[in-house]
Curated annotation (Swiss-Prot):
Binding site for Zn(2+) 2: C113, C116, C139, C142
Record-given protein name: Protein PHOTOSYSTEM I ASSEMBLY 2, chloroplastic
Cofactor, free-text remark: Binds 2 Zn(2+) ions per monomer.
Bias (Low complexity): 8-22, 39-49
Gene it is expressed from: PSA2
């Protein structure tokens, strides 16, 4: 299966002396499009240059600075269009809820436990007689999970939860949250 695309070739040709100023070097650009299966050789450029001399009144000469600027801009545009990367921020923006997200938990509905720092383990001091020993036990705040339900959005992840506490089951929801029976992401 052959792709039908064409390649553009640009050939600088000397500018006519009456079009260019004596202090400026000008270059005339001839662009020719040919398909992939057809080769581009110098014979084609000679025959096409004859046709350009016939239509010389229609063409305009371009300075080298303008030509280089156009080449740089075109190549930068082609490079930027050929590679499309999805950044982590834009991918995260696609997953967000349409109404925004909670500022405290960033829309996840859960925050790290402030007592254990998200590890789920708590350093407890065990004092026996003359020596003190630190033991790691289950965190009494998050019960070893390392996460707590966000107290601002109450686990919804939404920035505005007006009326949530007016619902009939809100009292049970708050009681579960304060006693640690309400799990994040549930």
């Amino acid at each position: 299966m052959a792709a039908s695309s064409s390649h553009l070739f640009a050939l600088p040709s000397p500018a006519s002396p009456f079009l260019s100023a004596p202090n400026r070097n000008r270059v005339r650009v001839l662009a020719k499009s040919c398909p992939e299966n057809q080769s581009f050789d110098s014979n084609d450029s000679d025959s096409s240059s004859e046709t350009t001399h016939k239509a010389q009144g229609d063409q305009k000469s371009v300075s080298r600075r303008q030509w280089m600027t156009a080449c740089v801009c075109a190549s930068a545009a082609l490079i930027s269009n050929s590679y499309t990367f999805v950044s982590v921020q834009s991918a995260a923006a696609l997953d967000k809820k349409p109404g925004g997200s909670c500022r405290n938990c960033q829309g996840s509905g859960a925050v790290l436990c402030d007592m254990c720092g998200g590890t789920g383990k708590w350093k407890a001091l065990n004092r026996k007689r003359a020596k003190d020993v630190y033991e790691f036990t289950e965190c009494p705040n998050c019960y070893g999970r390392g996460k707590l339900v966000c107290p601002v959005c109450l686990g919804t992840g939404l920035p505005n939860n007006k009326g949530l506490l007016r619902r009939p089951g809100a009292r049970e929801l708050l009681e579960k949250m304060y006693n640690g029976r309400l799990l994040p992401d549930s």
